[in-house]
């Protein structure tokens, strides 16, 4: 027997038992962004490696350790996208979508990072993101946070996520703060772990993001960036906080929130939960006013966020009954004997025409009624349609409820759709 080939570690199949939950999640995400007037953008999975080196930063963990990079036959260095923002900016610059324009965009698709696989963190993962361009005031920061908050309300989990926000200030203010922070950290270098010492040399703000309890204790009294802001960034942040309060959005200012990508400035935020263990961040974003120019475009203000769909599905299945419904049919059409099969096809197609939102499955492969009804039960269908030679001759259909104790009835072909709709709507 040939050896069975398995999926690559950290890259998972989405099986039928959970794909329905994915579809519902994706549908809600699409509905919410559409209600805010956002438009979809789709970009390639593979991009030039330079795109991510220039945007994310060459000394970030993503570029140094996590990207899937290879040379094609022309010798060009290509990378499977590790995130979506850089691709959106590249596409916007390339197609003239950004200069002197306002854009509200969203995307959804697979991303790739060579990380250690664990619950809620995978090497291929799916990301939903929102990106806005051409608006520099705190009002658009507020809008993207309100939009993300509406996701949680739509899923019924708003009590299980919390908003954390911070500001990184301007590039100039952050550079001055960096010097202050480096001096503080070097005095405590003997209390830092290996990863933090590396970050101290390459990206010292990321030391503040350490999850090591010993490092957290060592930097507990580190100077806060929020105390070193330029006046304009402080006013921007103060206005955002005031408007979040006015909008009824509860939040916590987290001075240790810095985000792992180099392109952020001013507002950064995360939605976090206590329900997923170590992988507590379910949505994260912020402002990146310099990235468009950094990638060859004109200076353009921008703000956005992204969320991992795997992590969101995991959260929903943890907190709610979502995903527990494993049915994949509403109506199961049985047929006794080869003579009745053409009638079963006619009935199935007529119902699909009349009730396009109802899931209708027709039995194939023969077998007696007992076998067919057993199969109907496995699909989770609420109704079974019973068809034999007698029903075919009389142009009637037996309708057998499988779940709620209603009486079996026989109806004419012409009234079948109305009867099915009525019985499915009954509680």
Curated annotation (Swiss-Prot):
Principal subcellular localization: cytoplasm
GO molecular function, one term: ATP binding
GO cellular component: cytoplasm
Catalytic reactions on record: tRNA(His) + L-histidine + ATP = L-histidyl-tRNA(His) + AMP + diphosphate + H(+)
Stored InterPro entries: aa-tRNA-synth_II, aa-tRNA-synth_II/BPL/LPL, Anticodon-bd, Anticodon-bd_dom_sf, His-tRNA-ligase, HisRS-like_core, HisRS/HisZ, HisRS_anticodon
Protein's cellular compartments: Cytoplasm
GO biological process: histidyl-tRNA aminoacylation
E.C. designation(s): 6.1.1.21
Keywords annotated in UniProt: Aminoacyl-tRNA synthetase, ATP-binding, Cytoplasm, Ligase, Nucleotide-binding, Protein biosynthesis
NCBIfam families in the record: hisS
Subunit structure: Homodimer.
Family: Belongs to the class-II aminoacyl-tRNA synthetase family.
Protein name (record): Histidine--tRNA ligase
Gene name of the record: hisS
């Amino acid at each position: 027997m040939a050896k069975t080939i398995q999926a690559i570690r950290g890259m998972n199949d989405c099986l039928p038992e959970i794909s329905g939950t994915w579809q519902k999640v994706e549908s809600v995400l699409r509905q919410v962004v559409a209600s805010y007037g956002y438009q979809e953008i789709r970009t390639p999975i593979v991009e030039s490696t330079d795109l991510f080196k220039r945007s994310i930063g060459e000394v970030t963990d993503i570029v140094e350790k996590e990207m899937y990079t290879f040379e094609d036959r022309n010798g060009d260095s290509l990378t499977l996208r590790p995130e979506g923002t850089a691709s959106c900016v590249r596409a916007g610059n390339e197609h003239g979508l950004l200069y002197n324009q306002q854009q509200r965009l969203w995307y959804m698709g697979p991303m790739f990072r060579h990380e250690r696989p664990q619950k809620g963190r995978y090497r291929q993962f799916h990301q939903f993101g929102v990106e806005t361009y051409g608006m520099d005031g705190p009002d658009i920061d507020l809008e993207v946070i309100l939009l993300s908050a509406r996701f949680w309300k739509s899923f019924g989990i708003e009590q299980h996520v919390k908003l954390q926000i911070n500001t990184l200030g301007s590039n100039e203010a952050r550079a001055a703060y960096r010097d202050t922070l480096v001096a503080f950290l070097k005095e405590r270098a003997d209390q830092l772990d290996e990863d933090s010492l590396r970050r101290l040399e390459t990206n010292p703000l990321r030391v503040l993001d350490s999850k090591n309890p010993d490092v957290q204790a060592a930097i507990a009294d580190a100077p806060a960036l929020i105390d070193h802001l330029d006046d304009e960034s402080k006013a921007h942040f103060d206005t955002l906080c005031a408007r979040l309060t006015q909008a009824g959005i509860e939040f916590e200012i987290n001075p240790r929130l810095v985000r792992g990508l180099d392109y952020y400035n001013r507002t950064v935020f995360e939605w976090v939960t206590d329900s997923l263990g170590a992988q507590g961040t379910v949505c994260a974003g912020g402002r990146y006013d310099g990235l468009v120019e950094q990638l060859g475009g004109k200076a353009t203000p921008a703000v956005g966020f992204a969320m991992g769909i795997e992590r969101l599905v995991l959260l929903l299945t943890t907190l709610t009954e979502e995903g527990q419904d494993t049915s994949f049919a509403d109506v199961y059409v049985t047929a006794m004997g080869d003579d009745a099969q053409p009638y079963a096809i006619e009935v199935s197609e007529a119902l699909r025409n009349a009730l396009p939102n109802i899931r209708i499955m027709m039995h194939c492969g023969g077998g007696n009624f007992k076998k067919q009804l057993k199969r109907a039960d496995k699909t989770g269908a609420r109704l079974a349609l019973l068809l034999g030679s007698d029903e075919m001759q009389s142009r009637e259909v037996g309708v057998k409820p499988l779940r709620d104790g209603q009486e079996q009835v026989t109806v004419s072909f012409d009234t079948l759709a109305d009867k099915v709709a009525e019985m499915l709507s009954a509680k």
